[in-house]
Structures are given as C-alpha cells and as structure tokens.
Design a protein with these regions (language model features):
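C-terminal/domain-edge helix-coil "capping" segments
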Residues: 25-45, 128-132, 139-181
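Second-shell loop/turn segments in exported
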Residues: 63-72, 89-90, 156-162
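N-terminal post-signal-peptidase region of extra-cytosolic proteins
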Residues: 33-38, 82-88, 118-122
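Solvent-exposed, polar/charged alpha-helical surfaces in well-ordered, non-transmembrane soluble domains
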Residues: 75, 79, 83, 87, ...
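Surface-exposed short loop/turn segments
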Residues: 27, 88, 95-146, 150-158
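A structural "domain/chain start" motif
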Residues: 24-79, 181
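Bacterial N-terminal signal peptides that target proteins for export
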Residues: 2-14
Length: 181
C-alpha cells in the first residue's frame, strides 16, 4: 500500500471521527447532572461477570412529545449499559454472575422550579419536567448494592430520536466514567 493511499485512508478515518465528535457535541447536555456512589468496602476489581436483574421505565406519554415513538428506551438503556459494562472489563454471564445489573428510569411531569424569564430577568415558577435514570450493581452473594449511578435532567420537549440517543449516551457514559474499577 502506498504512503499516499495510507495517508488518505487515515485522513478519512480522522475526518469521520471529527464528524462524530462534533455531532455529539451539538446535543445539549448542560442540564444533565451525574452522580454515583460505591460501597467503600466493595472491591469492584474483584467482580468479573454480570447479568440483568430487571428494569423499569416509568414514562406515560401517549402524545409522544417527551419520548420519541421511534425509540425503544428499554433496548437503548440496555445497549448503553452493556457497552459500558464491557468497556469496564465485565462479561455478561447468565450462569452464576458476580453482579446483577438493574436500572429504573422515570419522568416527573409535575416538577416545578424557578426559571429566569429572559425578557424581564425575573424568576418565575415554571413546569420543568425532570427525567432520571438510576443504574445499580448488586453483589449476587450478599444481594447488597456495590455501586449506583444516577443521571438527572430536564426532559426536552419534541426532541429528535438522534438527540435523545445522544443525551442518553452522554448520561450513561459519564455515569460509568465515575465508577472506580
């Protein structure tokens, strides 16, 4: 393979990576707050395998204004969590796993908070629906949680499927970045 062909090939890969990074940067994420907590007595490096404990998504949105109808959120959550677990060195195993993974996602449509009116600069009460995702890793021997991550965010109205996926990706990635391993 010639040098110019290799340079072209590497240049195209770099260009594609740049578009991916720039595309992800356009997804609004400044309202997403991440926190996590781990059991100080648990050695997360000692765990190797996991399996799913279950999940719950608590969203009632018949009009489809908060949850894009073309997205299966349960599948999206599982895909992202699986990806992060594998990136941390865990292997999924149905037979005798070290950890059980569970999550719950929900939306509080009645959340109210002070927001600054951009025209008058006065704070007023507004309905600001909030969404949350909590992921928990449970030791299968003790059945106690050893790590939990949480993402809280304002729910974006009439958001595209791509933006929703980008926000979820950001939240799950940041959540697992805080996991000691």
């Amino acid at each position: 393979m010639s040098i110019s062909h290799r340079l072209f090939k590497h240049g195209m890969v770099l260009l594609a990576a740049t578009f991916i990074v720039v595309g992800c940067a356009m997804v609004p994420t400044d309202d997403i707050k991440i926190s996590s907590e781990s059991d100080p007595k648990a050695n997360l490096k000692g765990y190797k395998t996991y399996n799913w404990a279950g999940s719950a998504a608590l969203v009632y949105d018949p009009a489809g204004q908060w949850e894009p109808p073309e997205i299966d959120l349960d599948s999206e959550f599982r895909f992202l969590i699986d990806r992060e677990m594998r990136a941390k060195g865990f292997t999924q195993s149905a037979a005798n796993p070290d950890l059980l993974v569970g999550y719950v996602a929900g939306i509080d449509m009645d959340s109210i908070e002070y927001k600054k009116n951009p025209e008058s600069k006065i704070k007023v009460l507004q309905n600001v629906p909030k969404g949350a995702l909590v992921v928990v890793l449970i030791d299968t021997d003790t059945l106690f949680p050893v790590w939990a991550g949480e993402a809280l965010a304002e729910v974006q109205k009439n958001i595209t499927a791509e933006s929703t996926k980008g926000r979820l990706d950001y939240a799950v990635s940041k959540m697992f970045a805080e996991m000691p391993r």
